[in-house]
Amino acid sequence: MSSIVEIHGREVIDSRGNPTVEVDVYTEDGGFGRAAVPSGASTGSREAVELRDGDKSRFLGKGVRKAVDAVNTVLAEVVLGMEVADQKGIDAAMIALDGTHNKSRLGANAILGISMAVAKAAADECDLPLYRYLGGTNTSLLPVPMMNIINGGAHADNNVDIQEFMIMPVAATSCTEAIRMGAEVFHSLKKVLKSKGLNTAVGDEGGFAPNLGSNEEALKVIVEAIEAAGYKPGEDIKLALDCASSEFYNKETGNYDLTGEGRVLTKQELVAFYEDLVAKYPIISIEDGFDESDWDGWKLMTEALGNKIQLVGDDLFVTNSKILAEGISKGIANSILVKVNQIGTLTETFEAVEMAQRAGYTAVISHRSGETEDATIADIAVALNAGQIKTGSMSRSDRIAKYNQLIRIEEELGGMARFEGMKVFYNLR
């Protein structure tokens, strides 16, 4: 394969109206790759650093000209002339140039933009779809979608503490059918909310953001919507939560302030709260049930629920192999959420997923609340045979872009395509 001859970064706009980095990579044999970098709202403190300008006169300080300049100057100088197929070498060279543990000098948004665009250019030069280039010939597993249909927490302006209430169409026979089932429940939920006089405006990730009386009320209306769409809750469709509990954790007291419900819970009480929800509703997965720093709380939760449901570490692990290794050794959680911009290169992303899978942890490939039309994560989910993807609701084109790419991939794979439904939770008893 040929070498990289041109790299160009630019500032574009994400789904929240904030700037982000987009990178184009060209090879000497005509390969081309373009990638846009996502951005999170609720972020883990140990995530790789997203470089913002801080100039209040542009985009309220959120401009990314510094990161774009890094792409077009110092990073380009290192990467130009390198073999486009040398993903590990390119990523390692950029990490070394940055020289920090969290990519804070040049910005994870700059480094990731190049990392993803390089992979796309290499795939283009090989005349292969990205999932096949990254995953090889055995790539065939389509993911079960986690579809965020009610938004709360940092993703919405309402009184619901839990950030995401999701559905997982586990009884579907294909990813395309799962997407259809999710769309039907989404439209059914809109009718249910309207019938109750509730708001049907959507949050950052396309889910509805109604003012509900409690977190449990959100689960009740979702179950009602599933039934109204003609499906059986718990049999056809499971529920999943992203609590994003760092957003309601009180570091001074060590307690969890569910302000929407007017309750303050200790670690033990929060575990009991989750156990009660799991007993009452067909919940198969809980993400970030405890704060990223509250490993004692995570241990309590894993001991109580780790054999029954998927316990996903997002802010807990931040797609970082070193932190994940510590979690595995301590028996914390049983799944990792994978966000490419938390770590900043494709190489490190793949390393984290491979480590998780070797340890019997599941991996959920995820979007961020600030997204673009870039659908790279759909290809990554298939390339890694991850079996699960979390990429928002059935509205907003930045979310739909990923679902449509999965539909195309499944069609392209034809009879080779696999969709495993409940089997993706291979570590539950």
UniProtKB/Swiss-Prot annotation:
Keywords: Cytoplasm, Glycolysis, Lyase, Magnesium, Metal-binding, Secreted. Signal peptide: none annotated. Binds a second Mg(2+) ion via substrate during catalysis. Mg(2+) binds at residues 242, 287, 314. The keyword Secreted applies. It catalyses: (2R)-2-phosphoglycerate = phosphoenolpyruvate + H2O. Coiled coil: none annotated. Its EC number is 4.2.1.11. Its cofactor is Mg(2+). Its main location: cytoplasm. Pathway: Carbohydrate degradation; glycolysis; pyruvate from D-glyceraldehyde 3-phosphate: step 4/5. Belongs to the enolase family. Catalyzes the reversible conversion of 2-phosphoglycerate (2-PG) into phosphoenolpyruvate (PEP). It is essential for the degradation of carbohydrates via glycolysis. This is Enolase. It comes from Magnetococcus marinus (strain ATCC BAA-1437 / JCM 17883 / MC-1). The lineage of its organism: Bacteria, Pseudomonadati, Pseudomonadota, Alphaproteobacteria, Magnetococcales.
